[in-house]
């Protein structure tokens, strides 16, 4: 058996017994040992493979610019990040905007508002649509990231990435969704159009909140690996795969309202399979990233 065929045999075996990521984890550990982390290679890895949960927060912090590439600076930089976090939190407590009883995700929202100069005059003011998006993402992030300082910074930078890097791309995603759904199942798209459901699908939930509150966090984090590392287009393929997975149910519904209501509250037990198939679809239509080196 050649070295390549041995490796392929091992990969297939690992996948069958539930250790699909063994070799990928080793590759990531090699990348993380570099004195200066190669963000391009970390992006490529994250686009190709799911990040092991033990390294996810670290990789996200590097890719979102919370940590610099140089290892020796990490402890000092995180110390500054923590000091800033505690200063902002203290300021909010002084002006009685938050208390120890305030839900953590809402604390993150108020901190973000204060730091971006958008804190309302009173905590009782109704939330803006952008605040609702931040809150949904923060609630999901809480389930993925244990440390509260990490969670705030990752949420903040994740939302900033949506508002800057992806600002022009996100409004194009509904059109791309229809395009790829048509390629995968034209009859399904025709049904949505005949029911006048196509313009009324839960696009805000899918593409503004990035499926926060729609998919369980254990599945969602594999989607967000791709978003953090440079592709918001993965969101399109998750939406397409949701429609393909629940095709029989959707085809049986004959009103836009019923279809939208169902898609806003899809059964959770298929989510892992949906995300895996969505990633395969994304690679099929957009290619698999390869290291430039």
From Swiss-Prot:
Tissue specificity statement from the Swiss-Prot or TrEMBL entry: Highly expressed in heart, and slightly in kidney, liver and placenta.
Keywords: Cytoplasm, Cytoplasmic vesicle, GTPase activation, Lysosome, Membrane
Gene Ontology CC: one annotated term: TSC1-TSC2 complex
SUPFAM superfamilies linked to this entry: Ypt/Rab-GAP domain of gyp1p
Gene Ontology molecular functions: GTPase activator activity; small GTPase binding; TSC1-TSC2 complex binding
Keyword Cytoplasm: yes
InterPro entries, alphabetized: Rab-GAP-TBC_dom, Rab-GAP_TBC_sf, TBC1D7, TBC1D7_dom2
Annotated Rab-GAP TBC domain residues: 50-231
Subcellular compartments: Lysosome membrane; Cytoplasmic vesicle; Cytoplasm, Cytosol
Record has DNA repair as a keyword: no
GO biological process per UniProt: activation of GTPase activity; cellular response to starvation; negative regulation of cilium assembly; negative regulation of TOR signaling; negative regulation of TORC1 signaling; positive regulation of GTPase activity; positive regulation of protein ubiquitination; response to growth factor
Subunit: Component of the TSC-TBC complex (also named Rhebulator complex), composed of 2 molecules of TSC1, 2 molecules of TSC2 and 1 molecule of TBC1D7. Interacts with TSC1 (via C-terminal half of the coiled-coil domain).
Chain's role: Non-catalytic component of the TSC-TBC complex, a multiprotein complex that acts as a negative regulator of the canonical mTORC1 complex, an evolutionarily conserved central nutrient sensor that stimulates anabolic reactions and macromolecule biosynthesis to promote cellular biomass generation and growth. The TSC-TBC complex acts as a GTPase-activating protein (GAP) for the small GTPase RHEB, a direct activator of the protein kinase activity of mTORC1.
Disease: Macrocephaly/megalencephaly syndrome, autosomal recessive: An autosomal recessive disorder characterized by abnormal enlargement of the cerebral hemispheres, intellectual disability, large head, optic atrophy and underdeveloped skeletal musculature. Head enlargement may be evident at birth or the head may become abnormally large in the early years of life. Additional clinical features include behavioral abnormalities, psychosis, learning difficulties, prognathism, myopia and astigmatism.
This protein's name: TBC1 domain family member 7
Species for this entry: Homo sapiens (Human)
Lineage: Eukaryota, Metazoa, Chordata, Craniata, Vertebrata
Chain's gene name: TBC1D7
